[in-house]
Every structure is written in structure tokens, then in C-alpha cells.
Amino acid sequence: MSFIFKFIATFVRKMLELLQFGGKTLTHTLSIYVKTNTGKTLTVNLEPQWDIKNVKELVAPQLGLQPDDLKIIFAGKELSDATTIEQCDLGQQSVLHAIRLRPPVQRQKIQSATLEEEEPSLSDEASKPLNETLLDLQLESEERLNITDEERVRAKAHFFVHCSQCDKLCNGKLRVRCALCKGGAFTVHRDPECWDDVLKSRRIPGHCESLEVACVDNAAGDPPFAEFFFKCAEHVSGGEKDFAAPLNLIKNNIKNVPCLACTDVSDTVLVFPCASQHVTCIDCFRHYCRSRLGERQFMPHPDFGYTLPCPAGCEHSFIEEIHHFKLLTREEYDRYQRFATEEYVLQAGGVLCPQPGCGMGLLVEPDCRKVTCQNGCGYVFCRNCLQGYHIGECLPEGTGASATNSCEYTVDPNRAAEARWDEASNVTIKVSTKPCPKCRTPTERDGGCMHMVCTRAGCGFEWCWVCQTEWTRDCMGAHWFG
């Protein structure tokens, strides 16, 4: 009955909008697809303030069912009736899964095939959408155990992706499906707690109801595993096959760590995969990539491809997900791909055509000195000296100026020691950090007034926390204590 009243109220409001704005309706209605495990797909318009009970009351009659016979699954969770649409992080043309509840006897058989400790239950936490319960994957286990309710709000998971459609760094949404049938009517037995849970296979089991016969992982009837993937949150969904590359090194700077290059404290940063977890802002990361690209200082890695390490020179710090380099411009990324291809040819014992404007990669026999650029410019050259092919010994190389590796991107060791994610404070940062306007040394403020004194030996600059300039009488009068 409550749904009928809400429906009438919504209809009246829409009519008033139509009369007031001459046909230009102002509405936040979401057009959503509802899929069943019997092959049906419905298109419904949902108001953000509606709850899941309203959705069931709208969908059930179209399926010839009662609302109590349905359950709604989204992003790995069975949603409770009290969950509202606006809590679910839905976008236009998102997909909800409406599954008919199985008879009690049938449900009992399915549940008995799963491990008792992994059996999902619809507790308050389990019935909330994944975006409401998932904590930031950068948090350590100890931080998760000791987190308070106030800290939990700030530590909700936030993801970044490179979207090929938007062609930029975008906010991302985590989604989940069955690893076997790729269906979205899948509920996880637990939330992911680290990036390995999300990026690696066979980490988190769950229950799949995408098909009329539930999926099982093996002949013993073990539950299937979840497959996580990401979508762009900044454009209309392209359906369940929509995908965006996750940039797992880019994070919200919840620890307020300064950039190791410019020392600014940015909201969004990249954390290198080294033991110290050095931090850089996105602009400085682009500058780092651009300068290394200009000098062809990217390195071939047997597992990760053409990549870069931490600029502080840390061991075991190569970037694994090369989609991070798509933060460069399109032209720069095309250049990166060309250099990567050329590097592969050279590593395989090949040569590059030296003719200006060509650069074709050529794989030739080890003892072959005369090389012809086939399928390219047709230039014939000497493999040893890369000059036009000749009879006899190669001419000695000229004494021209040799190339230098004077990189524009440099890292101060003192800054690198301060720009470490692993030594920053935990989830709530009650102590904020800003760089001294004179020497750029990060300075902490833990309450008190806005009059700051740089703690770096030899500096001692007095400055205003608000203005980030030299402390003056104006600062004293306007915001000494905030």
C-alpha cells in the first residue's frame, strides 16, 4: 500500500514539473535493467528515494510473482528491503538481478553443498550494498580491526580507473560476477580486504544464481569463486560487459603524505609498489613518465613489460599494471607503445631500420650483416654500423657529442624519506601536514593556533597555516585560532 501512495505522489510531482517547465522535466529517475535467471530482462524507472521493497512491488507483477517471492542482487550482495536506491551506487542503465526464491527444500540442498563456515547469511552488514560496506583496500589488517565508526566513513573504498571511453583518469565502481558463467546474480561470502582479493582469481567464493541451475566449482559441489571487475563511474553504463582498467596504485590520500618530488599534499596520489611505498602526486608522476620517456629510460621487465621503477631507486618497485602510463597524453602513450615494441625487437636480437621516419623492427639471422627493410622503406643497411650497406670494414664512429642522461625529474633523498606511505599515520589523520612556504619541509599541526614555525634546522620560518605565507599581524587578527 505504501508503494501505491509513493507512486501516486511521484506521478503528481511529475505532472507539476511538466506544467511548470513546459515539457522540460526535471527528474533524477534512473532507467534500470532488471534481469532474471530465466532469461527475461525488464526496463524500469526507479526514483532514488525508493527502497528495494518498492522495487520488488514494481517488478514482481511483471514476472507473475509476489514481491515476497523475489530477492534483488546487486554487486555481490542480496539487498535488504530497507536499502534505498540512492545507497546502491547505481547509474543510468545499471543492472539489477531479480531472482525467484527457491522452495525451502531446494535451498536446503544447495546450502548443504557449501562449507558451513562460508555459508552466507543476510545480516545487517551482508545486506548492505558493497559500496557501503567495503573499506579501502589500502588499509592493513590491524587498521581494519581497530577502526571506529567515525573513521569507517572516511575509509570507505574508493577506486580509480582509466576509462577508454572518457580517455582519462576516472572514478571507478567495483562490480562482481561468477567466474564460471560470468553472470551477475552472484553473492560473495565475504567482502574483499586487499587488492589481491580483487585482482587475483579464486580468492573469494560465493553463490551463483544467474542460471536456473546454480553453478558449482567442481564435482564435489563446492561453491564457485567471484570475479571482480571495474566500471567507469562517470559515464552511462554499457551493460554487464562494460569494463575499465583499474589503477590500483592510485589512491585517495587519506594519510596526507606529501609528494616525494614537490612535497605538496594532494588529495589523489600514486603509491609506488616499493617497500617504503613512496608517494607522488599525479602531476609529478606524469612528469616522471614524460622525462623518462624522452630519454628512453623505461625498462623491459620479463613479467610486467615496458615499465618504470620507483624514482627513489628502490628495489622490487616496478609498476606492474601498465595502464598507469595511460595518464600520459595520447601522443605520449603511442610513443611509449612504439618504444616498447622496439625494445622487444632489440631484446629478441633484432635491429631497427636507421632510415629517418622509418624505424621498422626487423628480426634477422645472427650472422647476417646485410639487412633490407622489408615491408618498410626498403632501405639496405649494414647491421654493424647501421649505415648504408657497404663492402669491407665499417668506418670508425664519429666523435660527436654523446647522449647524456640528464633527467629533468630528480628526487631529493630527504623528501623521499618523508614521502612514505608505510610510515604515515593510520586511518584518521588528526595531525594535518603542509609544506613550509620557504623550504618546503612538511610541517605538522595537531590543534592549537595557526601560527606555525618550521622545525627544519636552519630555517625556522614563521608562517600562517591558513594563508601559507609569512605570519603577519593580519593573520593574527583574522584567524589566529581558526
Curated annotation (Swiss-Prot):
Q: What is the effect of changing S94A?
A: Abolishes phosphorylation by Pink1 and reduces enzyme activity
Where does the protein end up? Mitochondrion; Cytoplasm, Cytosol
User: A single GO BP annotation from the record?
Assistant: positive regulation of neuronal action potential
Residues modified to Phosphothreonine: T187
Recorded catalytic reaction(s): these are: [E2 ubiquitin-conjugating enzyme]-S-ubiquitinyl-L-cysteine + [acceptor protein]-L-lysine = [E2 ubiquitin-conjugating enzyme]-L-cysteine + [acceptor protein]-N(6)-ubiquitinyl-L-lysine
Q: Where does Zn(2+) 2 bind?
A: C178, C181, C208
- List cellular component terms (GO): cytoplasm; cytosol; endoplasmic reticulum; Golgi apparatus; mitochondrion; ubiquitin ligase complex
Phosphoserine: residues bearing it: S94
User: Mutating C310G: what's the consequence?
Assistant: Loss of self-ubiquitination
Task: Please tell me where Zn(2+) 4 binds in this chain.
Answer: C274, H278, C310, C314
Q: How is it modified after translation?
A: Auto-ubiquitinates in an E2-dependent manner leading to its own degradation.
Q: A Pfam family name for this chain?
A: zf-RING_12
How the protein is activated or inhibited is described as: In the autoinhibited state the side chain of Phe-481 inserts into a hydrophobic groove in RING-0, occluding the ubiquitin acceptor site Cys-449, whereas the REP repressor element binds RING-1 and blocks its E2-binding site. Activation of park requires 2 steps: (1) phosphorylation at Ser-94 by Pink1 and (2) binding to phosphorylated ubiquitin, leading to unlock repression of the catalytic Cys-449 by the RING-0 region via an allosteric mechanism and converting park to its fully-active form.
Q: What happens when the gene is disrupted?
A: Pupal lethal; large percentage fail to enclose. Escapers that develop into adults display various phenotypes that appear to be the result of mitochondrial abnormalities and/or mitochondrial dysfunction.
Q: What is its main location?
A: mitochondrion
Residues that coordinate or bind Zn(2+) 3: C259, C262, C281, C284
Q: What is its EC number?
A: 2.3.2.31
UniProt tissue specificity: In oocytes, accumulates in early egg chambers where it is enriched until stages 9-10, localizing mainly to the posterior pole and anterior margin (at protein level). After stage 10 it is no longer detected in the oocyte (at protein level). In embryos, ubiquitously expressed in the early stages (stages 2 to 5) (at protein level). Expression levels decrease at later stages and becomes restricted to the brain and nerve cord from stage 9 (at protein level). Relatively higher levels of expression in the head compared to the body. Enriched in the dorsomedial (DM) dopaminergic neurons.
Q: State the function annotated in the UniProt record.
A: E3 ubiquitin-protein ligase which accepts ubiquitin from E2 ubiquitin-conjugating enzymes in the form of a thioester and then directly transfers the ubiquitin to targeted substrates, such as Paris, Marf, Opa1, Miro, pnut, Septin1, Tom20 and porin. Mediates monoubiquitination as well as 'Lys-6', 'Lys-11', 'Lys-48'-linked and 'Lys-63'-linked polyubiquitination of substrates, depending on the context.
Instruction: Copy the domain comment.
Output: The RING-type 1 zinc finger domain is required for ubiquitination activity. Members of the RBR family are atypical E3 ligases. They interact with E2 conjugating enzymes and function like HECT-type E3 enzymes: they bind E2s via the first RING domain, but require an obligate trans-thiolation step during the ubiquitin transfer, requiring a conserved cysteine residue in the second RING domain.
- Subunit structure, briefly? Forms an E3 ubiquitin ligase complex with E2 ubiquitin-conjugating enzymes. Interacts with Pink1. Interacts with Marf. Interacts with Paris. Interacts with septins Septin1 and pnut.
Task: Please report which protein family the annotation says this sequence is part of.
Answer: Belongs to the RBR family. Parkin subfamily.
- List the protein's name: E3 ubiquitin-protein ligase parkin
Organism per entry: Drosophila melanogaster
User: Which gene name does the record give?
Assistant: park
